[in-house]
């Protein structure tokens, strides 16, 4: 039974496809569930005010920045028309990146909650219905207001800037390694345990400028010499380097990265999966101190994928190296 408080909330539900909406294969391809189908599978949603928008059905690896920002604008219009919260269902492969992109630009107090599923509805024990119910309850909870974009799966509530997909198949694949979840859904009630501070939202860039801003990502590996890095500026306006541990690269790479940093913004992140890039602990060639001295921008706690999202947005605004560095100091 829905509490009177939640029954008064009005939630806009947008569907983007993904595992949560897979309904088996036909000769014509994969059959997709509509938003109405998803809601019908969760009887507890029957008493809530839901506005269902079947935006598009696309595998999450095919989602683009433009599509995500278009969705943000659609969701903004829904909030301006009276929706008190937003829920988006999508595939989980890129969910951590789309959630962070949304969080960077979402200007409203209304919660923007993203969810999905690891087991599709044709399998035993699909997790989509429970995840959708928890996401809607979170979007309808007054305590979730002002928290920006949230990711809700497995009855855990994660801040978009911290969440990672950490397992390829587990229903408990989403985690926030640096901070843990900020809340839980317990016996149907949303419990927010931590309220992370929010940064001022960035404006949505012009689509043409966004299309022209391309960011490469290079993950450093053992005995890496990456001769192609010199060619990166020919087709990209920025580069993210996923370095070892606290932000290190082989010493042989350091001069080339320093040269690149004089031509385009180069952000240094860690490939480790959690923890921060350091600033002034190690001093050898290829260390974080050396690379910053050569002009690389410290990504802080942002992982390589989120660093790429933020850098691309900033480049679409025409940000120079100094501006990029200032924003990463705030977000990282």
Task: Describe the residue ranges of each PLM region.
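ATP/NTP phosphate-donor binding region
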Residues: 1-77, 255, 274, 298
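Short beta-strand segments
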Residues: 14-16, 88-90, 113-116, 148-154, ...
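Short Gly/Thr/Asp-enriched flexible loops that form oxyanion-binding sites at enzyme active sites
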Residues: 88-110, 249-258
């Amino acid at each position: 039974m829905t509490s009177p408080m939640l029954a008064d909330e009005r939630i806009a539900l947008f569907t983007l496809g993904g595992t949560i909406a897979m309904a088996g294969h036909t000769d014509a391809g994969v059959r997709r569930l509509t938003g109405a189908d998803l809601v019908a599978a969760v009887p507890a949603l029957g008493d809530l005010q839901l506005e269902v928008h079947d935006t598009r059905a696309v595998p999450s690896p095919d989602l683009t920045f433009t599509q995500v920002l278009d969705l943000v604008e659609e969701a903004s219009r829904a909030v301006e028309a009276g929706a008190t919260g937003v829920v988006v269902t999508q595939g989980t492969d890129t969910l951590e990146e789309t959630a962070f992109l949304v969080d960077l630009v979402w200007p409203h107090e209304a919660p923007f909650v993203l969810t999905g599923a690891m087991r599709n509805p044709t399998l035993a024990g699909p997790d989509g219905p429970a995840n959708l119910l928890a996401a809607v309850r979170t979007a309808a909870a007054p305590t979730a207001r002002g928290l920006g974009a949230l990711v809700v799966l497995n009855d855990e509530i994660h801040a978009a800037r911290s969440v990672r997909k950490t397992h390829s198949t587990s229903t408990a694949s989403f985690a926030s390694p640096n901070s843990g979840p900020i809340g839980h859904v317990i016996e149907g009630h949303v419990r927010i345990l931590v309220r992370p501070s929010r940064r001022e939202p960035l404006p949505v860039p012009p689509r043409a400028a966004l299309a022209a801003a391309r960011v490469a990502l290079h993950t450093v590996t053992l005995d890496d010499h990456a001769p192609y890095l010199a060619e990166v500026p020919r087709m990209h306006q920025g580069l993210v380097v996923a370095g070892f541990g606290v932000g290190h690269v082989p010493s042989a790479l350091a001069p080339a990265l320093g040269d690149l940093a004089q031509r385009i913004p180069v952000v240094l992140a860690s490939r480790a999966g959690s923890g921060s890039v350091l600033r002034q602990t190690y001093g050898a060639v290829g260390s974080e101190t050396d690379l910053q001295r050569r002009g690389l921008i410290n990504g802080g706690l942002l992982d390589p994928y989120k660093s790429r999202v933020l850098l691309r947005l900033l480049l679409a605004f025409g940000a120079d190296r100094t501006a990029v560095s200032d924003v990463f100091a705030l977000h990282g």
